[in-house]
């Protein structure tokens, strides 16, 4: 089985940051990416389990994968076009 998290185009370490900082950093990072590129987000704020999927839906990006069973949380998103 392929690890979806193993080769992202970009990585964002949001460990130790609390809402709303992780989503603000994701938004800033995604703004500088090309459509189709992927971003791995590593976070430990429980609010990200709600905020990251909501951000993807609202901004029309794809939440490719998420791992939220334990810390740190990992999210892989693909920038929409």
UniProtKB/Swiss-Prot annotation:
Pathway: tRNA modification. Keywords: Cytoplasm, tRNA processing. InterPro entries: Sulphur_carrier_TusA, TusA-like, TusA-like_sf. The active site is at 19 (cysteine persulfide intermediate). HAMAP family: Thiourid_synth_A. PANTHER family: SULFUR CARRIER PROTEIN TUSA, SULFUR CARRIER PROTEIN YEDF-RELATED. Belongs to the sulfur carrier protein TusA family. This is Sulfur carrier protein TusA. It comes from Escherichia coli O157:H7.
């Amino acid at each position: 089985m392929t690890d979806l998290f193993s080769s992202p185009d970009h990585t964002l370490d949001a460990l130790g940051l609390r809402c709303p900082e992780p989503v603000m950093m994701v938004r800033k990072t995604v703004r500088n990416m090309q459509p189709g590129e992927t971003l791995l987000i590593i976070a430990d704020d429980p609010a990200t389990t709600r905020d990251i999927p909501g951000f993807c839906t609202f901004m029309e990006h794809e939440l490719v994968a998420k791992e939220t069973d334990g810390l740190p949380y990992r999210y892989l998103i693909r920038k929409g076009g």
